[in-house]
């Protein structure tokens, strides 16, 4: 690819950043489509995020992807949020239209699309959702919009717990889905929730390097063959949770599915063109 002065820049702002497959995936897609954009990753944490957004405007970047730990903070720095992004309270995509910044969240649509592509119908189902960060709440919100009956969200009593309660209130007030929030330390409640659940989704970074030997499921007997277990983490590809799930006879969906589908939607938002899906799956080695 010969980058010229006519090319526009798209970024990814996150910390840490080195594990991300998004730059490779998006640049392969842009090159295949013959579009005059290039995608670059920038190591940006909460402290440096405000300055990074000013830089985005000054450099007239087309937009940026947003990942941990900036997804919730980023909502404060855009001019407009989609209804779904408001419900989530976090974004993973910014589109810059001549200095006017629009915030989107494709994490939820991407993850739910990956579930649907596997042949699983979420309507009327119950999901146990781990975590209350940007990715997790995006999945919960989109699942609620698309027909989940109940979401049982579990999170540690950390800085995200109050945000989880606020998220649950927003979803309960604006959709037909019922969301409850429980401390993950309550292992009895966790076990009872899993026993009646249709889907278990890990929306936390537990399982991602350097936590690849960890799982929030301490007892594999809590997993049952009727349960669909899905991951947001894709590095490593086969997390400990997915290994546990397969041993228990559960159907699983790895983090590549979410990465692919959320990235496809981002691509279209930035470029206005269709994402070369089959080509990207092939060159990236995604089985999704």
Swiss-Prot record:
Cited Pfam families: SDH_C, Shikimate_dh_N
Pathway: Metabolic intermediate biosynthesis; chorismate biosynthesis; chorismate from D-erythrose 4-phosphate and phosphoenolpyruvate: step 4/7
Catalytic activity from the UniProt record: L-quinate + NAD(+) = 3-dehydroquinate + NADH + H(+); L-quinate + NADP(+) = 3-dehydroquinate + NADPH + H(+); shikimate + NADP(+) = 3-dehydroshikimate + NADPH + H(+); shikimate + NAD(+) = 3-dehydroshikimate + NADH + H(+)
HAMAP family with a match to the protein in the record: Shikimate_DH_AroE (MF_00222), Shikimate_DH_YdiB (MF_01578)
Purpose of the protein: The actual biological function of YdiB remains unclear, nor is it known whether 3-dehydroshikimate or quinate represents the natural substrate. Catalyzes the reversible NAD-dependent reduction of both 3-dehydroshikimate (DHSA) and 3-dehydroquinate to yield shikimate (SA) and quinate, respectively. It can use both NAD or NADP for catalysis, however it has higher catalytic efficiency with NAD.
UniProt cross-references to InterPro entries, sorted A to Z: Aminoacid_DH-like_N_sf, NAD(P)-bd_dom_sf, Quinate/Shikimate_DH, SDH_C, Shikimate_DH-bd_N, Shikimate_DH_fam
Native species: Escherichia coli O139:H28 (strain E24377A / ETEC)
GO molecular function: quinate 3-dehydrogenase (NAD+) activity; quinate 3-dehydrogenase (NADP+) activity; shikimate 3-dehydrogenase (NAD+) activity; shikimate 3-dehydrogenase (NADP+) activity
GO biological process, one term: amino acid biosynthetic process
Quaternary structure (record): Homodimer.
Amino-acid biosynthesis keyword on record: yes
Annotated signal sequence range: none
Binding site for substrate: 71, 107
Keywords associated with the record: Amino-acid biosynthesis, Aromatic amino acid biosynthesis, NAD, NADP, Oxidoreductase
Family: Belongs to the shikimate dehydrogenase family.
CDD domains in alphabetical order: NAD_bind_Shikimate_DH
Superkingdom assignment: Bacteria
EC id: 1.1.1.282
Name of the molecule in the record: Quinate/shikimate dehydrogenase
Binding-site residues, NAD(+): 132-135, 155-158, 205, 232-235, 255
